Swiss-Prot record:
Transmembrane regions listed in the UniProt entry: none
Cofactor(s) it depends on: Zn(2+)
Keyword Repeat applies: no
Subunit description: Part of the 50S ribosomal subunit. Forms a cluster with proteins L3 and L14.
Source organism of this protein record: Methanosarcina mazei (strain ATCC BAA-159 / DSM 3647 / Goe1 / Go1 / JCM 11833 / OCM 88) (Methanosarcina frisia)
Keyword Ribosomal protein tagged: yes
Role according to the record: Binds to the 23S rRNA.
One GO cellular component term noted in the UniProt record for this chain: ribosome
Cofactor binding remark: Binds 1 zinc ion per subunit.
Keyword tags: Metal-binding, Ribonucleoprotein, Ribosomal protein, RNA-binding, rRNA-binding, Zinc, Zinc-finger
Record CDD domains: Ribosomal_L24e_L24 (cd00472)
Protein name (Swiss-Prot/TrEMBL): Large ribosomal subunit protein eL24
Amino acid sequence: MEQRKCYFCGQMLEPGTGKLYIKKDGSTYFMCSSKCMSNFALGRLPRRTEWTEKGKIQLKKA
């Protein structure tokens, strides 16, 4: 089975877990939790959120 990565926080997802968000244009996003889903829906950027993988990298540079 294929492992997927959470679109928002970057955490690896086990097969059969997580949530799938599909936009009207057909693009799909895999989320690991409702925390990631709600932050994505609110329009927050992963690079500005401290607890995400992208945020940790971005904030180290600053």
